[in-house]
Amino acid sequence: MHYFALLLHPERTTPPSPDQQAVEMAEWERFHELAAPAIRAGDALAPAADAVRITGGPDAPVVTEGPYAEGAEVAGGYYVFEAADLDAALAIAQDIPAARFGAVEVWPMVEWRRPVRALAGDWLALLLEPVESASAPGSAEWIEGARAHEAFGRAADEHILTGAALQHHSTATTVQVRDGKTALTDGPFAEGAEVAHGFYVLAATDRDEAVKLASMIPASTVEVRRLAGISGL
């Protein structure tokens, strides 16, 4: 099975020192070496200050600057894992460095589209829906939405590098590690008005084109973030 891991942590206000950056990179390299057999995709995200939020749907998109989360933690990266079951995916997630100073949301995925090439400097479109209207895969509402995504896929096929729907938010698990102890919590990390519902990674020449493409996605809200292009995946 495939699982989507969304990495959440406090946004930095100042860059790390060269020594601290070297230490952190070594931690991420160790994780990649450890989890390499399970990692299928992933990357860090560019600063949240550069995020774009799109609301209103394809018929009347409204574009605003900044990330969707108004809390202390922002999305800092993502992974796609292949694991035998949820327990195996959570065991991988607890080794992600972000779990020690932030949190990792782990979501079962639906119908993952494998990347058509290595991802670097492309654009993550994170799809969000109001909690009360988020539908479960297989429901009539979900099937209707899937048809709309199929239409988007036909219109933007050459720009879609990968993507997937996520299972209902009730199936998500939040992973945090503090003082060597792992805490698992049912549900997403932030109890907000919106929850993740799916994602795409889009190829675009610049942010304007990425926003134009993301505005076509049939979702209540889309957060557009550039990939940092440092994972080599």
Task: Put a short name on every predicted segment.
Residues 1-233:
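Conserved, structured core segments of small domains
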